[in-house]
């Protein structure tokens, strides 16, 4: 089943939420306990719509454009882990729907674990997809280069799709289309990313900060998900993380690269539900 192909007829409520420190754009669907989704660097909330459709019969699913991304505010500074974590805490408090399950990919995983460690009273549990401590410098160098290369002018949506398909060769076409249609804005001469290039540069640098304290200190349940062929989280980084926290469950998704939730949405969905229902 192609989950990304099924979203056209499903209704999502999109709105901006003022949490006091910043205004964040969110997409919402469903009812029940609160489940928040946080995307990776340069991405936006739309990438989680296929998963939200499948989970919205049990949960109030809300995907967030994180600061500097999508249609959320883009301050000039403030792109460290604690800045993003404070946004998560502010959003949970503003929504006032009780403690939340956090599902994060990459940057979103880093931010979710940081928030859970810093604000345990606001978080029920975390699904951390393909971002751990101990990521090698070379992997972060490559990520930063990809991020900075994405700030360019595109002639039209087809040019965006072609660029994204080359950048993310394992992401299915329907998921590429979601990224293309949700992540770019018209400007003179074509289309540019909605994500702020200055914010992306600061965020990429911030991903190098030490994540060991957050993983060491977090007391809420955390599921670690890694793509088997991820070029960001190596098998060695995952092994060191498991030695740091042998109590945290791990799912390695066969055949998936870093973009686990888009490449393997069905396995991601099963991992989330098995973890929550355990």
Curated annotation (Swiss-Prot):
The lineage of its organism: Bacteria, Pseudomonadati, Pseudomonadota, Alphaproteobacteria, Hyphomicrobiales. Chloride binds at residues 41, 106-107. Pfam families: Abhydrolase_1 (PF00561). Optimum pH is 7.0. The active site is at residues 106, 130, 258. Changing residue 130 to N: Loss of catalytic activity. One of its GO terms (biological process) is vitamin B6 catabolic process. Keywords: Chloride, Hydrolase. Pathway: Cofactor degradation; B6 vitamer degradation. Belongs to the AB hydrolase superfamily. Catalyzes the final reaction in the degradation of vitamin B6 from (E)-2-(acetamidomethylene)succinate (E-2AMS) to produce succinic semialdehyde, acetate, ammonia and carbon dioxide. This is 2-(acetamidomethylene)succinate hydrolase. It catalyses: 2-(acetamidomethylene)succinate + 2 H2O + H(+) = succinate semialdehyde + acetate + NH4(+) + CO2. One of its GO terms (molecular function) is protein homodimerization activity. Homodimer. Its EC number is 3.5.1.29.
């Amino acid at each position: 089943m192609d989950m990304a192909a099924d979203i056209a007829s499903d209704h999502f409520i999109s709105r901006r939420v003022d949490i006091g420190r910043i205004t964040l754009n969110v997409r919402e669907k469903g009812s029940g306990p609160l489940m928040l989704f946080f995307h990776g660097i340069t991405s936006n909330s739309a990438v989680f719509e296929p998963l939200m459709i499948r989970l919205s019969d049990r949960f109030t699913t809300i995907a967030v454009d994180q600061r500097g991304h999508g249609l959320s505010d883009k301050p000039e500074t403030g792109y460290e882990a604690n800045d993003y974590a404070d946004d998560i805490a502010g959003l949970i408090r503003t929504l006032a729907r009780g403690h939340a399950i956090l599902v994060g990919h990459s940057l979103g995983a880093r931010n979710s674990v940081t928030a859970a460690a810093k604000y345990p009273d606001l978080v029920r549990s975390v699904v951390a997809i393909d971002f751990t401590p101990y990521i090698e410098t070379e992997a972060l160098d490559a990520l930063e280069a990809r991020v900075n290369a994405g700030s360019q002018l595109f002639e039209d949506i087809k040019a965006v799709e072609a660029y994204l398909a080359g950048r993310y060769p394992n992401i299915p076409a329907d998921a590429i289309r979601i990224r293309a249609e949700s992540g770019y804005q018209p400007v003179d001469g074509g289309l540019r990313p909605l994500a702020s290039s200055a914010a992306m540069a600061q965020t990429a640098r911030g991903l190098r900060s030490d994540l060991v304290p957050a993983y060491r200190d977090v007391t809420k349940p955390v599921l670690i998900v890694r793509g088997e062929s991820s070029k960001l989280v190596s098998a060695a980084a995952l092994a060191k993380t498991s030695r740091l926290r042998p109590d945290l469950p791990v799912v390695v998704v066969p055949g998936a690269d870093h973009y686990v939730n888009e490449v393997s949405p069905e396995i991601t969905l099963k991992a989330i539900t098995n973890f929550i229902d355990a």
